[in-house]
From Swiss-Prot:
PANTHER family: SERINE--TRNA LIGASE, SERYL-TRNA SYNTHETASE. Consists of two distinct domains, a catalytic core and a N-terminal extension that is involved in tRNA binding. Its EC number is 6.1.1.11. Belongs to the class-II aminoacyl-tRNA synthetase family. Type-1 seryl-tRNA synthetase subfamily. This is Serine--tRNA ligase. GO terms for biological process: selenocysteine biosynthetic process; seryl-tRNA aminoacylation. The keyword Cytoplasm applies.
Length: 426
């Protein structure tokens, strides 16, 4: 959530910044609600003051032996008027909060202009796409040849956009997860956390999925308003909700491996084949909680941590900075890592690493105690995938495929697969 003071004092500047997203801030609606809020706030304060004055007069009149009946009636009338005014103010503040909650984060100054992913700017590339001397197969056909990817049975069990893995491919999926976790824990010094896969509305509000993106979520059909997590970002970042950290504890680095569940409501007809876009998939998620002055450097660091996995696996990728029109609702700056997919002849997103400034922290009231002022201040939050496990599996199957239908196991994965060097149909 944006700082209400910023909206009150620099509304036009905020509106101008949000235009980089293609978002038109309704300044008139905000101004009208804010003026009504100030009027009601003033009325409440005036009624409170008048009630307090009249209450004191009752004591004086009683001491002087005067009839206090009329004064008691006046105080009762003021109490009723104040209660009504406070109720109206509370309702108006709810309207104002709903409006502000739907406003996306401001983008950082160096975020490029643009309307869509076509306008994202490439920052760097690593590795060279392999040249094959045979016809490249996509991961669906590679998996079918090995006998380890079964979409038909998954569809029978559940429906479209689910997958079933078995044998060496299931083992490779697990090995990728272990490689990611061990790298981030042992080398990058993240603390592993195990979190709930079901969250409440407050958690989803805190990270910015609610109220705007409810259609993308799987909601449990009971009266508790629980949801399956769309990303580990939600439960992991919400560890900080309502907390005040000592400055000496920062930065806090968490890593978690979880399944993720998304309805893909806006993706009808896109990536319907294979594992690229699934209702259920797994990720290893990185989250950092830092002081405001450290957040942009932390974004660079976290992105490098995600890149390290791709480099260990020898997978060609590129790094792009998202333009204003493609950046997420809560983010102020985002890098995407896109891995080379040979069957498609292009790079596809495998990790999105974002700095949120204090946007999520304000919604969650996640703070740290400034050692100089001894006052609590809002944290900055950063998160990213390190990496999406299923898409990494796709990239390995395609980039390491061989003409005979087998798949070479990257050296970094071999210790996690009992020293195997190749997977092939049994």
């Amino acid at each position: 959530m944006l700082d209400p003071k910023l909206l009150r004092n620099q509304l036009n500047d905020v509106a101008e910044n949000l235009k980089k997203r293609g978002y038109e801030l309704d300044t008139q609606a905000f101004t009208a609600l804010e003026e009504r809020r100030r009027t009601l706030q003033t009325a409440c304060e005036s009624l409170q003051q008048e009630r307090n004055t009249r209450s004191k007069n009752i004591g004086k009149a009683k001491a002087a032996g005067e009839d206090i009946g009329p004064l008691l009636q006046e105080v009762d009338n003021l109490k009723s008027a104040l209660a009504e005014a406070e109720q109206n103010l509370q309702a108006l503040q709810g309207e104002l909060e709903a409006l502000v909650s739907a406003i996306p984060n401001m983008v950082h100054d160096d975020v490029p202009a643009g309307k869509s992913e076509d306008d994202n700017v490439e920052i760097s590339k690593w590795g060279e796409p392999k040249t094959f001397d045979f016809e490249v197969q996509d991961h669906v056909d590679v998996g079918a040849a090995i006998g380890g990817l079964d979409f038909e049975t998954a569809t029978k069990i559940t429906g479209a956009r689910f997958s079933l893995m078995r044998g060496d491919i299931a083992s490779m999926h697990r090995a990728l997860t272990q490689l990611m976790l061990n790298t981030h824990i042992d080398e990058h010094k993240y603390e592993e956390v195990y979190v709930p896969y079901i969250v409440n509305k407050d958690s989803l509000y805190g990270t910015g999925q609610l109220p705007k993106f409810e259609e993308d979520l799987f909601k449990l059909t009971d009266d508790r308003e629980f949801y399956l997590i769309p990303t580990a970002e939600v439960p992991v970042t919400n560890i900080a909700r309502g907390e005040i950290f000592d400055e000496s504890q920062l930065p806090v680095r968490f890593v978690a491996h979880t399944p993720c569940f998304r309805s893909e409501a806006g993706s009808y007809g896109r990536d319907t084949r294979g594992m690229i876009r699934q209702h259920q998939f797994e990720k290893v998620e990185l989250v950092q909680l830092v002081k405001p002055e450290d957040s942009l450097n932390a974004l660079e660091e976290l992105t490098q941590h995600a890149e390290a996995i791709l480099q260990k696996l020898g997978l060609p990728y590129r790094k792009v900075v998202l333009c204003g029109g493609d950046i997420g609702f809560s983010a102020t700056k985002t890098y995407d890592l896109e891995v080379w997919i040979p069957s498609q002849g292009k790079y596809r997103e495998i990790s999105s690493c974002s700095c949120f400034g204090d946007f999520q922290a304000r919604r969650m009231m996640a703070r740290y105690r400034n050692s100089e002022t001894n006052k609590p201040e809002l944290l900055h939050t950063i998160n990213g995938s390190g990496l999406a496990v299923g898409r990494t599996l796709v990239a390995v199957l395609e980039n390491y495929q061989r003409e005979d239908g087998s798949v070479e196991i990257p050296a970094a994965l071999q210790p996690y697969m009992n020293g195997k060097t190749v997977i092939a149909k049994a």
